[in-house]
UniProtKB/Swiss-Prot annotation:
Its main location: cytoplasm. Belongs to the XseB family. Its EC number is 3.1.11.6. It is found in: Cytoplasm. GO terms for molecular function: exodeoxyribonuclease VII activity. It comes from the Bacteria. It catalyses: Exonucleolytic cleavage in either 5'- to 3'- or 3'- to 5'-direction to yield nucleoside 5'-phosphates. This is Exodeoxyribonuclease 7 small subunit. It is an enzyme of class 3 (hydrolase). Bidirectionally degrades single-stranded DNA into large acid-insoluble oligonucleotides, which are then degraded further into small acid-soluble oligonucleotides. Heterooligomer composed of large and small subunits. Gene3D superfamilies: Exonuclease VII, small subunit.
C-alpha cells in the first residue's frame, strides 16, 4: 500500500473521516468508472489508516483523574482503553 500523502497527513481526524465517508457513499452508489473507483478505494484505505493513527495517538494521550486516599487528585495515563 502507498504511503500516506502529504495532504492526508496534514488532515485532522474529522477532515479525514468526512472525506472517507464521502468516498464510501460514492463507492456504494456504484455509478462511477472502475478506474475512478479503484483510485477512490486506495485513497479511502489511506484515509482509514490515517484515522486509525489519529485515534491511537489520542488514546495514548487520554488520562483519567485519580483520587488519592488523602483526597489529593492526580492524573494517571490509561493503559488499556
Amino acid at each position: 500500500m502507498a504511503e500516506i500523502s502529504t495532504d492526508i497527513a496534514a488532515m485532522s481526524f474529522e477532515e479525514a473521516l468526512a472525506e472517507l465517508d464521502l468516498i464510501v457513499r460514492r463507492l456504494e452508489e456504484g455509478k462511477g468508472r472502475l478506474d475512478d473507483s479503484i483510485v477512490a478505494y486506495e485513497r479511502g484505505a489511506l484515509l482509514k489508516k490515517h484515522c486509525e493513527a489519529k485515534l491511537e495517538e489520542a488514546r495514548t494521550k487520554v488520562e483519567r483523574i485519580v483520587s488519592g486516599p488523602d483526597g489529593s487528585v492526580a492524573l494517571q495515563a490509561v493503559d488499556n482503553v
